[in-house]
Amino acid sequence: MGPRRQKRKPETPRRRPASPAPAAPRPTPSLGTSSRPLARRRHTVLKEIRTLQKTTHLLLRKSPFCRLAREICVQFTRGVDFNWQAQALLALQEAAEAFLVHLFEDAYLLSLHAGRVTLFPKDVQLARRIRGIQEGLG
């Protein structure tokens, strides 16, 4: 005799859901903006650039810049810590920001000349090299 086989139970039909739940409606973009996140991000970046170009306030925060200026001063004076006037630090920060803005403008023009939109370190290096020793700080 062979192995015994069990009787099969009749299967009860399983309940299936009628249909999948409808997806939640996506919010429609207002004022005709593109629904793609990349295009939206690009527009917000361009808007931020335009607003920052119109402003005249300082973009670097004062306390980190003051700490950096004092740290560099201590390095060049062999440990002697000088007292800085607030106006002197403000003038130094204005000059540093003007230098950086001008450098990045030139570097971005070089990247556009190369047919790119992305700014690479080699663009900044070339801008400093073209400026020379006086304007490029060596």
From Swiss-Prot:
Keywords: ADP-ribosylation, Centromere, Chromosome, DNA-binding, Methylation, Nucleosome core, Nucleus, Phosphoprotein. Residues 19-28 have a biased composition (Pro residues). The keyword Nucleus applies. Residues 1-40 are annotated as: Disordered. One of its GO terms (molecular function) is DNA binding. Residues 73-114 are annotated as: CATD. Trimethylated by NTMT1 at the N-terminal glycine after cleavage of Met-1. Methylation is low before incorporation into nucleosomes and increases with cell cycle progression, with the highest levels in mitotic nucleosomes. The modification Phosphoserine is found at S19. One of its GO terms (cellular component) is chromosome, centromeric region. The keyword Phosphoprotein applies. Residues 37-52 are annotated as: Important for flexibility of DNA ends that protrude from nucleosomes. It is found in: Nucleus; Chromosome, Centromere. Residues 39-138 are annotated as: H3-like. The modification N,N,N-trimethylglycine is found at G2. Component of centromeric nucleosomes, where DNA is wrapped around a histone octamer core. The octamer contains two molecules each of H2A, H2B, CENPA and H4 assembled in one CENPA-H4 heterotetramer and two H2A-H2B heterodimers. CENPA modulates the DNA-binding characteristics of nucleosomes so that protruding DNA ends have higher flexibility than in nucleosomes containing conventional histone H3. Inhibits binding of histone H1 to nucleosomes, since histone H1 binds preferentially to rigid DNA linkers that protrude from nucleosomes. Histone H3-like nucleosomal protein that is specifically found in centromeric nucleosomes. Replaces conventional H3 in the nucleosome core of centromeric chromatin that serves as an assembly site for the inner kinetochore. The presence of CENPA subtly modifies the nucleosome structure and the way DNA is wrapped around the nucleosome and gives rise to protruding DNA ends that are less well-ordered and rigid compared to nucleosomes containing histone H3. May serve as an epigenetic mark that propagates centromere identity through replication and cell division. Belongs to the histone H3 family. PANTHER family: CENTROMERE PROTEIN A (PTHR45810:SF14), HISTONE H3.2 (PTHR45810). The CATD (CENPA targeting domain) region is responsible for the more compact structure of nucleosomes containing CENPA. It is necessary and sufficient to mediate the localization into centromeres. This is Histone H3-like centromeric protein A. The lineage of its organism: Eukaryota, Metazoa, Chordata, Craniata, Vertebrata.
